[in-house]
Amino acid sequence: MPGSELYEHFMALHTRDGGLVMPNAWDGLSALILADAGFEAIATSSAAIAATLGRLDGRHEVTREEHLEHARLLGRLTRLPVNGDFEDGYGDTPEDVAATVEAAVESGLAGIGVEDTSGDPEKPIRDFDEAVNRVRSAVEASKGRIVVTGRTDNFIQGRPDLDDTLRRLTAFAEVGADVVYAPFPPDRDALIAIVTAVAPTPVNVLVSPSDKVLTVPELQQAGVKRISLGPLLYTHAMAAVEQATKALLAGDLASATTGMSFARVNELLARGKN
């Protein structure tokens, strides 16, 4: 599908009634499971990719080409739109961000996210003007071929400044971001404030892993148009592995060896080849 058609298709999933639930895959089989379940689009997760490779997230320990190859694999197997969680755009300058957007388009991605993180523990969030210029560069490079998400990580980085978050997301929308995103909003009121401030630009939400998570209908009623999970499905799967290994160490072989049959694994893999 040409980039412009893929863009229109992916954007339509954001603007329809109800919006889009877009889970994140971390390898070929997890992507095929999500496709088989009926999801209409999937995403990469920089944290999950890094973890599968034994590396840390957010420090470019996973290279841009490695991330692109991973995204191409997910798209090739599932034939679904793939959104790339490309951290800060893999570079310090707006030109670096533009180059990453172009590479994502050439790799057939449907969407790409650009964060305002810096990778500097002393100053984890980039200055306002710098952050906006980087999103602007991504939008200009996209040329209507890939959905650009402008993201601020204020909440994740321990900066619970809602006013600054709203200012950043509003500016991202004003320079043309197709979607905006602030992971881990502290509560429903903050989420509604974000949706209201940037309307009609669609808002993505990544909820924090807690017992206070809103349901999909509740998030959609609040005006959210896209729901992603980041690394949460991956960590859910790893929790099951950890539990099984503890059972095995305790002598419980049955608990450690029950799960998806390999016939089912092969069935899913065969679908990826069709």
Can you say where each PLM-predicted feature lies in the sequence?
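Alpha/beta enzyme core
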Residues: 2-205, 209-229, 236
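Extended, intrinsically disordered, low-complexity segments
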Residues: 3, 10, 230-274
